[in-house]
């Protein structure tokens, strides 16, 4: 028997590297400190997708700190995405080929890296909205990620 103040780990699938479904997405557990990476949406039929700041899994809340490479690759239905405020990393090719994606809102002020070709093939009139205190830094961070010059980054 496990004391009340400790979590039982026997038979638990909540191990680092395991994938879990929550809401409209699939998440991979990335750390023992209750962090996950958003892997991909459960289906690619949605026109709007919100990558949340946190998700509820079987043993509690987990912070969503990254978006996996190719998460929305070639998703032609997607028009709008919101990225939660705990995300620090956006993987390579995340929105690659999402040609109808016209609006990306980044709520996170913690973003440190954006992978190669993350924005390749998004709509040429896409607007990327970022926190106003991070406008200059994020313009640099999002530079040359495959998007057309007509893609706007605003606050």
Question: Model regions: which residues?
Answer:
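Ser/Thr/Gly/Pro-rich low-complexity, disordered linker/stalk segments of secreted
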Residues: 1-18
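Intrinsic disorder/low-complexity segments enriched in polar/small residues
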Residues: 7-8, 20-21, 80, 148
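Consensus positions within tandem repeat domains that build extended binding/scaffold surfaces
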Residues: 69-71, 91-94, 116-118
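Short intrinsically disordered, low-complexity segments
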Residues: 13-14, 70, 102
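A structural signal for leucine-rich repeat
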Residues: 96, 117-121, 139-145
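Structural signature of tandem-repeat unit edges
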Residues: 2, 26, 31-32, 44-66, ...
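GGW-centered surface loops in extracellular recognition modules
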Residues: 21-42, 140-146
């Amino acid at each position: 028997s496990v004391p009340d103040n400790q979590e039982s780990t026997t038979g638990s699938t909540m191990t680092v590297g395991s994938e879990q479904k929550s809401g409209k997405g699939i998440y991979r557990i990335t750390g023992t400190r209750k962090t996950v990476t958003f892997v991909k949406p459960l289906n690619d039929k949605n026109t709007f997708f919100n990558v949340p700041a946190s998700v509820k899994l079987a043993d509690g809340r987990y912070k969503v700190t990254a978006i996996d490479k190719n998460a929305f690759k070639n998703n032609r239905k997607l028009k709008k995405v919101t990225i939660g405020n705990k995300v620090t990393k956006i993987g390579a090719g995340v929105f690659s080929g999402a040609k109808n994606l016209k609006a990306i809102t980044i709520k996170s002020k913690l973003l440190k890296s954006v992978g190669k070709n993350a924005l390749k093939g998004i709509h040429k009139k896409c607007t990327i909205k970022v926190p106003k205190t991070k406008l200059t830094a994020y313009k640099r961070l999002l530079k040359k990620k495959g998007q057309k010059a007509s893609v706007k980054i605003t606050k």
